[in-house]
Amino acid sequence: MSRRNRAPKRDILPDPKFKSQVVAKFVNHIMLDGKKSIAEKIVYGAFDKIKAKDASANEVEVFEKALDSVSPMVEVKSRRVGGATYQVPVEVRPERRQTLGMRWIIDAARKRKESTMGDRVAAEILEAIEGRGAAVKKREDTHKMAEANKAFAHFRW
């Protein structure tokens, strides 16, 4: 066990365009090699494409709805008991839910075939709202894993 204190949680400043912490966190997740301006262009470009598809919709609300449809409620964690390793289903904390949802949307977007990353992110968000897409499939697979291993739920710690 480490004797060091846990690092203090840093506050994330809301993004300049939408004044949303969730969008700022998404920009930070997309960012590679510290290039935040490029990450912002990708996210804001994706949001513009979402707005173009449905002018009446608020881009941030659409994104948050998509994030909610992708975020997992339960996941499995490995737990070793008496020489055997069990996949124990555990509930996901709200902060981790959001982080996993963002990570899965980005991973799914990076694997898509559209020409620009902005197009890929927009397409993945729109598919997530409709309940399809790779990110939603990842969530369903995670839930299936947890359901299949429900018998080991009593090994929770």
From Swiss-Prot:
Belongs to the universal ribosomal protein uS7 family. GO terms for biological process: translation. Part of the 30S ribosomal subunit. Contacts proteins S9 and S11. NCBIfam families: rpsG_bact. One of the primary rRNA binding proteins, it binds directly to 16S rRNA where it nucleates assembly of the head domain of the 30S subunit. Is located at the subunit interface close to the decoding center, probably blocks exit of the E-site tRNA. GO terms for molecular function: rRNA binding; structural constituent of ribosome; tRNA binding. This is Small ribosomal subunit protein uS7. HAMAP family: Ribosomal_uS7_B. GO terms for cellular component: small ribosomal subunit. Keywords: Ribonucleoprotein, Ribosomal protein, RNA-binding, rRNA-binding, tRNA-binding. Pfam families: Ribosomal_S7. InterPro entries: Ribosomal_uS7, Ribosomal_uS7_bac/org-type, Ribosomal_uS7_CS, Ribosomal_uS7_dom, Ribosomal_uS7_dom_sf. It comes from the Bacteria. The keyword Cell division does not apply.
